Structure formats: structure tokens, C-alpha cells
Design a protein with these regions (language model features):
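An N-cap/entry alpha-helix motif that binds or orients negatively charged groups
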Residues: 1-110
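C-terminal helical cap(s) of enzyme catalytic domains, especially alpha/beta-barrels
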Residues: 7, 14-24, 246-253, 282, ...
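Catalytic cores of alpha/beta
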Residues: 17, 165-177, 213-226, 262, ...
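Active-site mouth loops of central-metabolism enzymes
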Residues: 32-33, 43, 96-116, 156-165, ...
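Alpha-helix-loop-beta-strand connector modules within alpha/beta enzyme cores
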Residues: 77-90, 140-163, 194-210, 244-264, ...
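Glycine/Thr-rich beta-alpha phosphate-binding loop at enzyme active sites
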Residues: 99-113, 118-140, 219-257
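Glycine-enriched alpha-helix->loop->beta-strand junction motifs that scaffold or abut catalytic
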Residues: 126-127, 152-156, 175-181, 201-205, ...
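Glycine-rich phosphate-binding active-site loops on the catalytic face of alpha/beta enzymes
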Residues: 132, 172-192, 231-240, 284-305
Length: 313
């Protein structure tokens, strides 16, 4: 059903066409056909390829098999509560530390990438939760990293950081040990958000809904689905440019007032490198932060956490 795709020559697989055209989702949730049949930005390229990738994954491991593995997965940990607990304990935003090897904009960030070693260092450094990149082509991650980290005995709740466009990915995330998933509003309309949130909740996982614009945030807040956590990504996924003021400006609108009144846990994402940055998003109203590059590129990520917060957690 999703996402619509273009033809294979853009994916490096010859000229045979898929049956679909590329679409975009406006901040209001309306779909727009891409008549040029080619990705217009990095986000569309990622989502476009995801459709092909999922076709291969389903051929290799059918959904019925994945759902069977969900029943054998480790017990779900409460991702949201772990953040709240740290926030109340420290008086600072709960830390979601990201296990990340590379990105489309920066290339390889940590050449000596060892997901288990990094995850353990984050845990020792006091992270409330971990975010694990599972996209293979663009971020050099994988769903197996979730499993490796969980089997290594790491007790922090895990977020599956993936460009989710299909229910298959949600079940696979839980089967590999994830406790929460990310849903990106720029990729999904409200029908998708409601449907995928329902599936995640059915297997015990929490959902981090991500927005970047006023329109996306307004759409999510008006949706008829439960919001566990709401993240504001300071990175424009179309260009991968980062601006910390995105969080500040959105939280200064009436929407920021609404999330405070509804007691929604807000997560500041991307562009957080210093204690000053932490203070900026906290003062804007964020109870948690998701940090990757500034921590993972260091040889001692646990020390990086101390530097980021100005003290041990």
C-alpha cells in the first residue's frame, strides 16, 4: 500500500518500472503526485528506496513469520516512563542517545562502529533511552543492531529509528527488541499515523511522532490518535539542514501552549551539541532530547554525555 515508488533506474536496478509514482505529503496531510517520477529531495529518495527494500525483506521473511517472532521477543520496556523518570530525577531533559554509524549528509560519523559497545557506553553514561538507526542504505544501520544490543544485556529502552512506511517494519522492530518506534509526519498522512500507532500499541510499544513544521505539528495535534511523545526535528529532512530555532519557534506558538496544557512529553531532535543547546530546547519546553552525532563520534560516548549536560547523569 505504501509508499508509492518510481522506477528502478533511480535505485540503481535497471530501467524496469514499478507500478507506482512517487508522492509527497503536505504539512496538512494531503498527498501530492510526483509527476516527474524521480525523487526531489533526500527524504523522498529514502522513502522511495524503502518500498523496494521492503519488497525484498518480505520475500526473504514473510510477515506471518515476523509476527510469530514478536511473540518470542523480550518483554517491552516503558520508553516514555524512562524519560519521565530521568527528567524528574535530574531536572534536565531525559536523554535519548543515538546508536548511529553514518548519515546521508555527513557520511560515516563513527568509522569504528560497534553498536553494542556504543550502547553500553551510553547506558553507563546515564542515558534514559537509546535510539537505534535501522536504515541500511543511507545510514548503514540495521534491525539486527536492535537484537544485538538487547541480547548484550543493555537495559535502556530502545527506539527503532526507521523511516516507517509499512506495518511490516513495526512488527519487525518489536521482534528485534524495540520498545518504541519513530513515525515521521512528513512521510505519513493522519490515516497512516493512526493505523501505525494502533499497531505499535497493540504489541506494547510507544510511539515518537516527529514533526518539523507548524503545519505538521498542527495536523498531529488535531489527529484522533493517542500521542505518547512528540518530537520536533530541527533538521529539514528534505535538505538535511539543521536549525535549533525550529524547536524554539514552534514551541512559542499556540501549539506549544497546547502541548503543555495536554502534558505531552516533547522531544528536541538534531542540532544539540552543547550544554547551551540543551538549555535552549529545555527552556523552549522539551522534556527530552535525542542526540546522535555529537555523542557517537567520540571515542568515549559516556564522557560525551557528561560534557553535553555539564555533569554526570
Amino acid at each position: 500500500r505504501r509508499p508509492p515508488a518510481g522506477h528502478k533506474e533511480h535505485l540503481g536496478m535497471g530501467s524496469e518500472r514499478f507500478a507506482f509514482k512517487m508522492e509527497a505529503v503536505t504539512p496538512e496531510g494531503e498527498r501530492i503526485d510526483n509527476e516527474e517520477n524521480k525523487p526531489r529531495n533526500i527524504l523522498e529518495e529514502i522513502v522511495w528506496y524503502k518500498d523496494y527494500e521492503l519488497t525484498l525483506m518480505k520475500e526473504k521473511m514473510p510477515l506471518s513469520l515476523v509476527r510469530g517472532q514478536v511473540k518470542l521477543a523480550p518483554p517491552v520496556l516503558d520508553f516514555k516512563q524512562a524519560i519521565i523518570d530521568q527528567m524528574e530525577k535530574t531536572g534536565q531533559p531525559g536523554l535519548i542517545a543515538e546508536v548511529k554509524k553514518a548519515s546521508p549528509s555527513k557520511g560515516v560519523i563513527q568509522p569504528n562502529f560497534d553498536p553494542v559497545k556504543i550502547a553500553k557506553a551510553y547506558e553507563e553514561g546515564g542515558a534514559a533511552c537509546l535510539s537505534v538507526l535501522t536504515d541500511e542504505k543511507f545510514f548503514q544501520g540495521g534491525f539486527e543492531n536492535l537484537k544485538l544490543i538487547k541480547e548484550a544485556g543493555v537495559t535502556c529502552p530502545l527506539l527503532c529509528k526507521e523511516f516507517i512506511v509499512d506495518a511490516y517494519q513495526i512488527y519487525l522492530a518489536r521482534a528485534r527488541g524495540a520498545d518504541a518506534i519513530l513515525l515521521i509526519t512528513a512521510v505519513l498522512d493522519n490515516q497512516d499515523l493512526k493505523y501505525f500507532t494502533k499497531i505499535a500499541h497493540s504489541v506494547g510499544m510507544k510511539v515518537l511522532l516527529e514533526v518539523h513544521t507548524y503545519g505538521e505539528m498542527k495536523r498531529v495535534l488535531s489527529g484522533d490518535f493517542e500521542i505518547d511523545l512528540l518530537g520536533i526535528n530541527n533538521r529539514d529532512l528534505g535538505t538535511f539542514k539543521v536549525d535549533l530555532n525550529v524547536t524554539v519557534e514552534l514551541m512559542a506558538t499556540e501549539l506549544g501552549k497546547e502541548v503543555k496544557e495536554r502534558n505531552i512529553v516533547m522531544v528536541g531532535e538534531s542540532g544539540i551539541f552543547t550544554i547551551d543547546d540543551v538549555n535552549v530546547v529545555q527552556n523552549a519546553g522539551c522534556g527530552a532530547i535525542l542526540v546522535g552525532e555529537s555523542l557517537v563520534k567520540q571515542d568515549t560516548p559516556d564522557v560525551g554525555i557528561k560534557k553535553l549536560f555539564g555533569r554526570p547523569l
